[in-house]
């Protein structure tokens, strides 16, 4: 029977552990499957995580054991250490593309279709935003026989340009929960940027590029003897 989050929802720790295994399988295949220590490190890393967690070895082991009982992860014995790999695609009955989107939502929280396409670059290269939306729509319209929807489109928060998607692997959300998630996701903070060095680096690079373009435009306007746009 396909995974039904309404009957057996994941805990927050289980979602983080599962998402971490799914991520590392795609981004660092040479180090996969993962040892317990590697899973803990991946769960608690500060980049590409929202929220940032401080799960203990015991908490991660408990989550792994629970996921194993539901056939969502597999324990692999080894001479030096036990390793773990995910079995989510088969357990949930979803294609790799959908699994990639769900993994990103578990690790990074609610995101727009455009953000998911960018963040999925190392997981799966979607041709365009429309292809991302197509897989999200399939996950949202998942039939009752298959376990019901696995994602939901949050209401657009005030001031936000687009609505964000969230996963339902931890159980259904009430209207109040969805509104709260939408508001929180649409309000990035300086601490959130600091917790994600990769994001801060991208922002700094974009700011530098904009500054360089403005400088080039100012020089060109000077050569032509015209004012810089936006200036008298």
From Swiss-Prot:
It comes from the Bacteria. It holds the Pfam family DUF480. Belongs to the UPF0502 family. HAMAP family: UPF0502 (MF_01584). This is UPF0502 protein Aave_3438. It comes from Paracidovorax citrulli (strain AAC00-1) (Acidovorax citrulli). The lineage of its organism: Bacteria, Pseudomonadati, Pseudomonadota, Betaproteobacteria, Burkholderiales.
